[in-house]
Amino acid sequence: MFYTYYYTSPIGKITLASNGTHLTGLWMEGQKYFPSHLPADKTTTLLSVFRQTQEWLDAYFKGENPDYLPNIELKDTPFRVAVWEILKHIPYGETVTYKDIAKEVARQNNRQSMSAQAIGGAVGHNPVSIIIPCHRVIGSNGSLTGYAGGIERKIALLKLEGIDTGKFTLPPSKDTKNPLR
């Protein structure tokens, strides 16, 4: 069975997905790579994993750093899952670069190097946004490049965590509104 639940957040409607025991997806409305269709199965009660996720999100959007993760099940290629596991360990209120993650993946696989672009592809397809904090990943030049939920949401999440976004830059095509300040 496949279940969905909708959570209303300060950054818009969020869709949660579960297999009944684990969180399998968390997408913001209009997010890039949002599933084109979700199965029709619905839950008539608030599943335990949805309650756990809702509590996590409630705390997070109050500016708190939840000290646990909901039960999450990640299924994809071994490469993507490895990248998402690394993302889970980026501390609240901190950022890392795609290059940093590439170095860590290379280290874990006894390789000399790894493409930061390949890392970007995996980060961009993270199925559990916010909780697996892909919004904390930036370009090595300080650019807030790429976020499937949109640059404005990435900035809002970083600010919520107390990060000074004024020190970052926007990709050239996104620099019209300057939402960093």
Language-model regions: role of each:
Residues 12, 28-31, 75:
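Histidine- and/or cysteine-centered catalytic micro-motif in compact active-site loops
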Residues 1-24:
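DNA-contacting interfaces and partner/effector-binding or oligomerization modules
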Residues 3-10, 55, 64-181:
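Nucleic acid-binding interface residues in structured DNA/RNA-binding domains
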Residues 18-69:
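Compact structured core domains
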Residues 15-16, 25, 97, 146:
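A sequence-level detector of short linear motifs
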Residues 13, 17-19, 47, 119-120, ...:
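A generic structural signal for ordered secondary structure
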